[in-house]
Regions:
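Active-site metal-coordination/substrate-binding segment of hydrolases
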Residues: 96-196, 201, 221
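N-terminal capping segment at the start of a domain
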Residues: 28-56, 161, 350, 410-411
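Flexible, glycine/charged-enriched surface loops at secondary-structure junctions
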Residues: 48-49, 77, 191-196, 279-294, ...
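A non-catalytic alpha/beta surface segment that caps or lines the substrate-entry region
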Residues: 50-99, 103-105, 109, 120
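Zn-dependent metallopeptidase/amidohydrolase metal-coordination segment
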Residues: 301-303, 377-430, 435
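Midchain, well-structured core segments that form catalytic/ion-binding scaffolds
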Residues: 148-151, 157-170, 204-327, 331, ...
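Active-site-adjacent substrate-binding region
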Residues: 268-285, 292-294, 341, 351-399
Length: 436
């Protein structure tokens, strides 16, 4: 079924599930139509295949669509690389040819921590109270104002949601759609002031590899922004320092009836180890600049157990202390056992880009001006996560992060206001004008 037929069907649907669905009109903005189309293309990355780029072949499905659309919009060099990087260049407007080129970057992939295939977007006219995205097994999939107080400010808005069975994919297809809509505006009116623009859509951001293979020299930009944040107005130039710790526990299986003094249960070793890490430094107890240990997964038998943690902190010294505590916990257990049964492997992932971006305050100032020019109050926040901009900044391309307008990423309650999609495209237009 052609995408426009799917779009027409989705937007004409007026079934009620705890909220009023908006009927289609002939005035749907370009960015909305693009967004609804892009989220229906599955692009989940796969951490199990992190040794290859892209980690999932499905990311080419969107990459090829975007490359073709960019060519149709006049970016003659637009292409998708063998690793699913979509790159294109837009010439500067008249009078801005001598200005430094500016990059705009978003990522193709969606996370695998929630179902991401078969996304069925729809538009809910939100009237307050619980936001009900859909139903699963006869039960509403809802977000309450108690859990998300920001909903109180969105009454009367049209919100794009999934049907409650999958994530939506606003992270980061909202950013993709907003950049593409800006390119479409420039194609329609090349006199809109802008420097030469580099456009890039990267794969595998969700598994920490999004910027690794971007050829910065060929990209040719002095500065860049990722469009990968949350609610409208977010402006981020600090992120976590990040590492992954894989901890292995070797047990000794003995018949339980003969186990005294002989059995070493690897599953229990894991429990002992996990208890040595401060529980108040788990994600569910932290906010702002507070770092954490996050147990992402564990598998255990009596003979062997493996636990995978991610470790995060904005402060480099506190980050190192967290890594040192993991090593110390393993050493303590090994000393108690009199044998090296606990081993730790730590893999560095990314560093706090504030180390680089703080030397380019003009990038923050110009972004603030662009938000304010569009009637949006900028909110400068630390990223409680990572972004392609972290890797790029340390590779020589200073790269703060801008909002997309989305909420509740990485879950079935994810949504984005239609007005935020439009407004963020306006912000990007104002931003590039200030570099012209």
């Amino acid at each position: 079924m052609p995408w426009h037929t799917v779009l027409e069907f989705l937007l004409h649907t007026t079934t009620k599930i705890g909220a009023v669905f908006m009927e289609n009109t002939t005035t749907n903005p370009d960015v909305l139509e693009r967004f609804l189309r892009y989220v229906q293309i599955n692009t989940q990355s796969e951490d199990a295949n992190c040794d290859q780029v892209p980690s999932s072949a499905v990311q080419f499905d969107l990459a090829n669509v975007l490359a073709e659309e960019l060519r149709e919009l006049g970016a003659e060099d637009a292409h998708a690389t063998e690793h699913a990087y979509v790159c294109a260049h837009i010439p500067a407007s008249v009078g801005a040819e001598d200005k430094p080129a500016l990059g705009l970057i978003a990522h193709l992939d969606t996370t695998e921590v929630a179902p991401g295939a078969g996304v069925k977007p729809h538009i809910v006219h939100y009237e307050g109270g619980d936001l009900v995205c859909g139903t699963v097994d006869g039960k509403p999939v809802a977000m309450s104002t108690a859990k998300l107080p920001a909903l109180n400010d969105l009454a009367g808005e049209d919100l794009v949601c999934s049907d409650g069975t999958t994530l939506l994919g606003a992270d980061d297809k909202a950013g993709v759609a907003e950049i593409m809509s800006l390119v479409a505006r420039i194609a329609q009116d090349p006199s809109l002031p802008h420097p030469a623009l580099g456009i890039c859509f990267c794969p595998d951001e969700e598994i920490g590899h999004g910027a690794e293979l971007l050829d910065i020299d060929t990209f040719g930009c002095k500065y860049a922004y990722t469009v990968d944040g949350g609610p409208i107005g977010e402006l981020e130039w600090e992120c976590f320092n990040a590492a992954e710790a894989t901890v292995c526990f070797e047990g000794q299986s003995i018949h339980p009836g003969d186990a005294k003094g002989r059995m070493v249960n690897a599953g229990n070793l894991f429990c002992d180890f996990n208890a040595l890490l401060p529980y108040v430094q788990r994600p569910e107890y932290t906010e702002g600049y507070e770092g954490f240990y996050h147990l992402e997964g564990v598998s255990a038998t009596v003979d062997h157990a493996t636990a995978r943690y991610i470790v995060r902190d904005h402060d480099a010294a506190k980050f190192q202390q967290k890594l040192d505590l993991i090593d110390a916990a393993a050493s303590m257990l090994n000393q108690r056992l009199g044998d090296k049964r606990v081993t730790v492997e730590i893999k560095q992932q990314y560093r706090n880009m504030a180390e680089i971006v703080r030397d380019y305050p003009e990038l923050i100032d110009v972004a603030k001006e662009a938000y304010l020019a569009c009637g949006v109050e900028p909110q400068v926040l630390p990223i409680r996560g990572g972004t392609d901009g972290a890797q790029l900044s340390f590779r020589g391309l200073p790269c703060p992060n801008l909002s997309t307008g989305g909420y509740c990423y990485h879950g079935v309650n994810e949504f984005v206001p239609v007005s935020s999609l439009v407004k963020m495209t306006d912000v990007l237009q104002e931003l590039v004008a200030r570099f012209a």
